[in-house]
Amino acid sequence: GRIPKLYKDGYRNPIYTTNATCDLCAIMLPDSGHIQETEAEWKNRKRIRRGELPIDPIYDAETAAKCLELFKGEPYDQIIELDDNIHVRFNDAGHMLGSSTIEIWIKENGENKKIVFSGDLGNNDIPLLSEPTMIEDADFLVMESTYGNRKHIRNDNKAELFIDIVTDTLKKGGIVVIPSFAVGRTQEILYELNRIKDSNLD
């Protein structure tokens, strides 16, 4: 989300991403820039009424669109040479479209080290997504761990519970409102609704 800010501050080097992330950013970053502009306008109306100086948006839609020229989409499971001493590989993290666990091989002072970096990891058996790629070794591991100390109870019938709630609400004449992230969860919800529709279940 802050890549356009880096561009605004002068960054002009390549930005390596997975192919899917590159495609998503082409849509999402200019939209994010528009949101930044709108929020700054809203805040500035209040600031001006209070006699305060206006603020600039963190970045705008034009900057967000320009930074996309630096993006280099890469496939999963392919080693990319950044220079003689640094190589990287994107592996499917199974969290959302384009998410990755990154292996980084660094050669420094004749010594090779491997760093693995990952944000969120997906679960197994999720429709629409591949299972996370297992990384077998690393000298250093850096990863997101919001739920690292929790044991999640597997709920194999969560789709059916979801459909039961939707069906029950509609039968009562209610309206179903499902707050969800635009990328990831929304597609899973639409998949489940379409699956039930295609199955002709009531």
Annotated model-derived regions:
Residues 1, 6-188, 194-199:
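His/Asp/Glu-rich metal-coordinating catalytic cores
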